[in-house]
A protein has these predicted regions:
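DNA breakage-rejoining catalytic core of tyrosine-based enzymes
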Residues: 1-15, 111-123, 137-139, 218
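Short alpha-helical segment immediately N-terminal to, or the first helix within
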Residues: 20, 33-34, 181-185, 195
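Conserved tyrosine-mediated DNA breakage-rejoining catalytic core shared by Y-recombinases
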Residues: 46-127
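Active-site/catalytic core of tyrosine-dependent DNA strand-transfer enzymes
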Residues: 121-166
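Basic, Lys/Arg- and aromatic-enriched nucleic-acid-binding interface segment
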Residues: 2, 7, 11-41, 45
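C-terminal secondary-structure termini that scaffold catalytic or DNA-interacting sites
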Residues: 1-5, 65, 73, 222-226
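Catalytic-site neighborhood detector that most strongly recognizes the C-terminal catalytic loop/helix
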Residues: 196-221
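Short basic/aromatic active-site micro-motif
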Residues: 149, 166-186
């Protein structure tokens, strides 16, 4: 479910937030990617694995037996528990296509990971390359797991305070900012959904208060002033 209580960051606030990360290669890179792709933290870092631990009765359903007689059966829902320290998906160094300016991501849909692609700006590509070289990362290394999942969430709060932002800021603000800025430029929900991996274009309307090649040029042009 998409949260509706996010207080939007203005461009000035987002610029200030980015300025506070200068000198910290990892967080500057992570925030820049999040800001210019609108991707969820789970798609960048990876989603925490879960295991089935049982089922919960949530109601009843009526079915018919072989004689046509109505039978009341329990309607259940699977209960999952997160597995500490284990993640699936997430961007690896080999998922960055420097030649074509694309990045593979794994989107969780109906508990299954589905491969998608997102467009990267020239600045973002250069920043990623700089980080990879400086940290001597290999093809199989996970690009955004140089810090813990929790650590990244806490860092957003810390850097936003240093930037002088008074309202609450979370990692979701980057996705919110990305969508909001594109809508200000007149982008349709359908076009934005192709970039963000939203399940439906209808979900994007909440932000009103495989990459299609036909929008790559438009995307890079729009992101120049992000």
């Amino acid at each position: 479910m998409v949260k509706t209580d996010v207080i939007p960051c203005t461009k000035e606030e987002m610029d200030s937030l980015m300025d506070t990360t200068i000198g910290n290669d990892f967080y500057y890179m992570f925030f820049l990617v999040a800001k210019t792709t609108g991707r969820r933290i789970g798609e960048l870092y990876g989603n925490q694995k879960k295991k089935e631990i049982g089922r919960k009765i949530i109601g009843k359903k009526i079915e018919h037996d072989e004689n046509g007689k109505e039978v009341a059966l329990a309607k259940t829902r699977v209960i999952y528990k997160k597995i500490k320290g284990e993640y699936e998906g997430g961007v690896q160094v080999k998922d960055i296509d420097f030649e074509n300016g694309l990045m593979k991501v794994w989107v969780l849909k109906r508990r299954k990971l589905v491969q998608d692609e997102t467009i990267l700006t020239k600045e973002t590509l250069q920043t990623i390359k700089h980080f990879i070289v400086n940290n001597k990362l290999k093809e199989e290394d996970y690009l955004f797991r140089q810090k813990s999942y929790r650590g990244i969430q806490e860092a957003v709060k810390s850097f936003s305070k240093k930037a002088g932002i008074k309202h609450k800021v979370s990692i979701h603000n980057f996705r919110h900012y990305f969508v909001t800025q594109l809508k200000k430029l007149g982008w349709t929900n359908d076009k934005i959904a192709k970039l963000t991996g939203h399940k439906s274009v209808g979900m994007i309307s909440i932000y009103d208060h495989v990459v299609a090649s036909d929008i790559k040029k438009d995307t890079l042009e729009a992101l120049k002033d992000f």
